[in-house]
C-alpha cells in the first residue's frame, strides 16, 4: 500500500515532530506517512519483537535469581522500569485509532475575525511550549541512556547468590552489561558480549524514547488545551464590550471596534455609514457547520432587530447590519470554542486514561521497592548513584503528568472567575445570560483521570511522594 503525501492541519501539524519521532522509534502510527506503509509496518513489528525479546530476557533473569533478597529487589525494579516502555508501546499500537481521533479533533481550527489575533498568539505560545517540552524530554532521555551505559564500566560486575545449604551469600562474576539479563549464549566475552552490549544499548534508547514520546504527546495535548482556555479568558472582556453596543448607549461607538483583540491597535471592523450588502458578510470562518447556523436562519425571531417603522436603523449606537451580526456571532464563537475544548479534554482522557492507570500502578510498586533500596545506601558509590537515578527518573515521570494535569484544572476553573470579573453588567441582556451560563458550566474544573480511579494533579504527586518518604522513614527506623 502506498500513501500519498497530504497537507496536515491542527494538532497533527503542531505535533508533527513528535509524531515523526514516534514513527522513527517504531510506534504503530501509520496514518501520517507518505510512501509504502508495508515497510513501516515491518519496521514497527521488528522493533516490537526485539523489545519483547530483551524484556523476556530481563524477566528470565528475575525468575532465575530469587534466592537473595537484595538481588531479587534490584531485578524487580529493573523489570518494572521497563514495564512502562513495553506497556506504552503496546498500548499505542492497540489504541492507535483513539490517538488518530484525538489528533483529528482540531483539524479545522476555525476562528472569528475579531479574535483571530488573540487566537494566533496563544496558538503560537502553545506551539513553542510543546516544542520546548519535546526537546527537553528527549535530551533528558538521551543523557539518561548515556549515563546508564557509562556507569556500567564502574564498580564490580557481580551478582549475589544465596546458598541454601550453607545459608550464606556469595558473589558471582557476570558479564559487564548495562542490564542484567538471561541469554541462551555465553555473553562473558568475545562476539557474544559485543552483540549483547549493542543489543542492550539499542533496547535502552528505543524503549525509553518510546515511553517518553507517548507521554510527551499526552502532555502536549494538555498544553494546547490550557492555551486555548487562556485565549477564551483573554477575549472575555472585549466580548462584553462588544455586546454592550447592541442595546446600551456608548458615546464613542466607533472606538468600540478598535483594540478588541487583546490590546491590538488595528481597526477590526469599519463603521460604515450605510448598510453593506449582507451577502458580503462571510460566516464561513466562524464554526460554519449547518448545524450551528441553520437554526438561526430558520428562526429569524432569535435575532433582535433595531429597525424602526420607517426602515431606518434604530440601533442606539448606529451599528450596521454587518456589525450586529459580527457582535452576535462573537458570543456564539466563544461558546462553540469552549465546547470544542471540552470535547478535546474528553478525548484526551479516553485516549490516555488507561495508560496513566497502568503507569501509576507500576510506579507505586517500583517507588516502594526503591525506598527499600535507598535505606541500604551508605556511600556515594555505583550502587547509591544507581538507586538515586532510578528514584529521580521515576518521580520525574509522575511529576510530568501531574504538573500539566494540575494546570488544566487551574485554567479551566479560572474561566468562571474571568467571566465574572469582566464588565458583564454593561453588556446586553444576551451577554448577561451568556455570562450566567458560562459561570454555571465552568463551576466544575476539567480534569484528566486515570481510567476514573484518580485525578491527575499535583495532589496525586504529593500523595505518591509522601507515601515514598513515609515508607523510607519507617524502614530507616526498623533498620
From Swiss-Prot:
Tissue localization of expression: Expressed in female antenna, maxillary palp and proboscis. Not detected in male tissues.
InterPro entries (alphabetical): 7tm6_olfct_rcpt (IPR004117)
Topology relative to the membrane: Multi-pass membrane protein
Protein name: Odorant receptor coreceptor
Any one of the GO BP annotations: signal transduction
Extracellular membrane side: 65-73, 155-187, 366-383, 477-479
Pfam family, one: 7tm_6
Disruption-associated phenotype: RNAi-mediated knockdown results in significantly lower blood feeding rate in female mosquitoes. Lack of sensitivity to all tested odors in antennae of female mosquitoes. Lower preference for humans as hosts for blood feeding.
Upper lineage: Eukaryota, Metazoa, Ecdysozoa, Arthropoda, Hexapoda
Source species: Aedes albopictus
Annotated glycosylation sites: 167
Disulphide linkage map: none
Residue spans crossing the bilayer: 44-64, 74-94, 134-154, 188-208, 345-365, 384-404, 456-476
Protein function: Odorant coreceptor which complexes with conventional odorant receptors (ORs) to form odorant-sensing units, providing sensitive and prolonged odorant signaling and calcium permeability. Orco is a universal and integral part of the functional odorant receptor, involved in the dendritic localization of other olfactory receptors. Required for detecting a host for blood feeding. Plays a key role in preferred attraction of females for humans over non-human hosts for blood feeding.
A single Gene Ontology CC term: plasma membrane
Family stated for the protein in its record: Belongs to the insect chemoreceptor superfamily. Heteromeric odorant receptor channel (TC 1.A.69) family. Orco subfamily.
Subunit (UniProt): Heterodimer with conventional odorant receptors (ORs).
Record GO terms (molecular function): odorant binding; olfactory receptor activity
Cytoplasmic topological intervals: 1-43, 95-133, 209-344, 405-455
Location of this chain's protein in the cell: Cell membrane
Keywords, sorted A to Z: Behavior, Cell membrane, Glycoprotein, Membrane, Olfaction, Receptor, Sensory transduction, Transducer, Transmembrane, Transmembrane helix
Keyword Transmembrane helix tagged: yes
Amino acid at each position: 500500500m502506498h500513501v500519498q503525501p497530504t497537507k496536515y492541519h491542527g494538532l497533527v501539524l503542531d505535533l508533527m515532530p513528535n509524531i515523526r519521532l514516534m514513527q522513527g522509534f517504531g510506534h504503530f502510527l501509520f496514518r501520517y506517512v507518505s510512501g509504502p506503509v508495508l515497510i513501516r509496518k515491518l519496521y514497527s513489528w521488528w522493533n516490537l519483537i526485539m523489545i519483547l525479546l530483551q524484556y523476556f530476557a530481563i524477566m528470565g533473569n528475575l525468575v532465575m535469581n530469587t534466592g537473595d533478597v537484595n538481588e531479587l529487589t534490584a531485578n524487580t525494579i529493573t523489570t518494572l522500569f521497563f514495564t512502562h516502555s513495553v506497556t506504552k508501546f503496546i498500548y499505542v499500537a492497540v489504541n492507535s485509532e483513539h490517538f488518530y481521533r484525538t489528533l483529528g479533533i482540531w483539524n479545522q481550527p476555525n476562528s472569528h475575525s475579531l479574535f483571530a489575533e488573540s487566537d494566533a498568539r496563544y496558538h503560537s505560545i502553545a506551539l513553542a511550549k510543546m516544542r520546548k517540552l519535546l526537546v527537553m524530554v528527549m535530551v533528558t532521555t538521551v543523557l539518561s541512556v548515556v549515563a546508564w551505559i557509562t556507569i556500567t564500566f564502574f564498580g564490580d560486575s557481580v551478582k549475589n547468590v544465596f546458598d541454601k545449604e550453607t545459608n550464606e551469600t556469595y558473589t558471582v562474576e557476570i558479564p559487564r552489561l548495562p542490564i542484567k539479563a538471561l541469554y541462551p549464549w555465553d555473553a562473558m566475552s568475545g562476539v557474544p558480549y559485543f552483540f549483547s552490549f549493542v543489543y542492550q544499548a539499542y533496547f535502552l534508547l528505543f524503549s525509553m524514547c518510546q515511553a517518553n514520546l507517548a507521554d510527551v504527546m499526552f502532555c502536549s495535548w494538555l498544553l494546547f488545551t490550557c492555551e486555548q482556555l487562556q485565549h477564551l479568558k483573554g477575549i472575555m472582556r472585549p466580548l462584553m464590550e462588544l455586546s454592550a453596543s447592541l442595546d446600551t448607549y456608548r458615546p464613542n461607538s466607533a472606538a468600540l471596534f478598535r483594540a478588541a483583540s487583546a490590546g491590538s491597535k488595528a481597526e477590526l471592523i469599519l463603521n460604515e455609514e450605510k448598510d453593506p450588502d449582507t451577502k458580503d458578510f462571510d460566516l464561513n470562518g466562524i464554526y460554519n457547520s449547518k448545524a450551528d447556523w441553520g437554526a438561526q436562519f430558520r428562526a429569524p425571531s432569535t435575532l433582535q432587530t433595531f429597525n424602526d417603522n420607517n426602515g431606518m436603523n434604530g440601533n442606539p449606537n448606529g451599528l450596521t447590519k454587518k456589525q450586529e451580526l459580527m457582535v452576535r456571532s462573537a458570543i456564539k464563537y466563544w461558546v462553540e470554542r469552549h465546547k470544542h475544548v471540552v470535547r478535546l479534554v474528553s478525548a484526551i482522557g479516553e485516549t490516555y486514561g488507561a495508560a496513566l492507570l497502568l503507569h501509576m500502578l507500576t510506579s507505586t510498586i517500583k517507588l516502594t521497592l526503591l525506598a527499600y533500596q535507598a535505606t541500604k545506601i551508605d556511600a556515594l558509590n555505583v550502587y547509591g548513584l544507581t538507586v538515586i537515578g532510578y528514584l529521580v527518573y521515576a518521580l520525574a515521570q509522575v511529576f510530568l503528568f501531574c504538573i500539566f494535569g494540575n494546570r488544566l484544572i487551574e485554567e479551566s476553573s479560572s474561566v468562571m472567575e474571568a467571566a465574572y470579573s469582566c464588565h458583564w453588567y454593561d453588556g446586553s441582556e444576551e451577554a448577561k445570560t451568556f455570562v450566567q451560563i458560562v459561570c454555571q458550566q465552568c463551576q466544575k474544573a476539567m480534569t484528566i483521570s486515570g481510567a476514573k480511579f484518580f485525578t491527575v494533579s499535583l495532589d496525586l504527586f504529593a500523595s505518591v511522594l509522601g507515601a515514598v518518604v513515609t515508607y523510607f522513614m519507617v524502614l530507616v527506623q526498623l533498620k
